[in-house]
Swiss-Prot record:
UniProt site (Important for tRNA non-discrimination): 77
Outcome of swapping residue 77 to C/I/L/F/S/V: Seems not to be able to charge tRNA(Asn) in vivo, but Asp-tRNA(Asp) formation is not affected
SUPFAM superfamilies, A to Z: Class II aaRS and biotin synthetases, Nucleic acid-binding proteins
Listed NCBIfam families: aspS_nondisc (TIGR00458), PRK05159.1 (NF003483)
Quaternary structure and interacting proteins, as annotated: Homodimer.
Protein name: Aspartate--tRNA(Asp/Asn) ligase
Species for this entry: Deinococcus radiodurans (strain ATCC 13939 / DSM 20539 / JCM 16871 / CCUG 27074 / LMG 4051 / NBRC 15346 / NCIMB 9279 / VKM B-1422 / R1)
InterPro entries: Aa-tRNA-synt_II (IPR004364), aa-tRNA-synth_II (IPR006195), aa-tRNA-synth_II/BPL/LPL (IPR045864), Asp-tRNA_synthase_2 (IPR004523), Asp/Asn-tRNA-synth_IIb (IPR002312), NA-bd_OB-fold (IPR012340), NA-bd_OB_tRNA (IPR004365)
Main location: cytoplasm
Compartments it resides in: Cytoplasm
Amino acid sequence: MTSPLKRTLTRELPQHEGQTVKLQGFVHARRDLGGVQFLVLRDVTGVTQCVGSGLTLPLAESSVEVVGKVKAHPKAPGGFEVQVEDFRVISAATEATPVEIPKMEWNVNPETMLDYRVVTVRGLKERAALKVQAELVDAFRAHLRGEGFTEISTPKIVSAGAEGGANLFPIDYFGHPAYLAQSPQLYKQIMVGVFERVFEVAAVYRAEEHATSRHLNEYLSLDVEMGFIEDEEDVMGLENRLLASIMERLRATSQAEFELLGATIPDVPAHIPRITLMDARQLVTEKYGHPVGGKDLDPEAERLLSQHFAETEGSDFVFVTKYPRAARPFYAHPELNEDGSVNGEVTRGFDLLFRGIEITSGGQRIHDYGMLMDSIAAYKLKPESLEGYTEVFKYGMPPHGGFAIGAERLTAKLLGIANVRYARAFPRDRHRLTP
């Protein structure tokens, strides 16, 4: 029979010393020493030790109810234990878990961990990572609302890609070809004409056949777009403030999770260092002997560049600016020459590196209709496939720009998680559709 007492959470026990409380949660661990039974109960706020006699303990992960008196105990988790007066099994586990949830480190194949993700995600470290991400996303929303942004929701079934048609998942839309959205980019820009400052928190889909520790085919994208800017510096300034606000929130809400995972919350400089892509390539080549080819920085170059700024400026963050046109999509605003003419080689695009990995791409976008149509032609795209997007630029779009942060990448780097898949509850990569 359910106790009439109101439920108490484990984190509230210090407020109830000497009182009788009701706890509800999961059997995290158990020991039977003959006449005395020890039960570690886990709820959403933590774990606590419960001690009783004559108890028949169910299998681990069973959900249970404990009624008992709170007593200070220096060796118990959290410094308190509950002396059991009444015990009830709410829902019994029917078989042993494939891994021992209480273990802080599991010596099993990483793929096995994901195969049994519905259970392993209950682990304290796994739960902590997702809790940090939830706080991060909430802080993202709160800061942007404070700066006058409006949250929007854009289609995830689209007729064309935001980045030229590559890396799209095709679907059959009632007999018509369609795709899963790889980015809300085009809709974000359209909505600048409505709310001026917008953001979205939503999944995006990339049909990229990567098998790396930094890529997912479905991930949570934190997207921002703002109008009436001067140039990309306004956008980088916003992201600088946003990240500082997020870290401040994490210090207030998530210290326990960071301590559990052995991670530290970074300081965000008042002015995150900037370096142009060309200078970054030269620095990495000359200082570290790592030649950089292609149109972007490779992963090792990102790591070395981050190392340089951590050592020389004490910053875990660095903006890499002035990306070449070949490395940016058609809507990236070109740099202008001193005479005001268009520089056909360089854009006002940037990336943000954090602890050795890119977590953001952003920049100023083209807002002039003629320039946009010229860019679409230069990229050899079909104008008719983008008419729903380009139409709005006939009607006074302001200078605007924005960025997107990959929530899982940021979470993984914050917490020292080696593979981005473990920063998502149920990851999707090129080999995984379940659970």
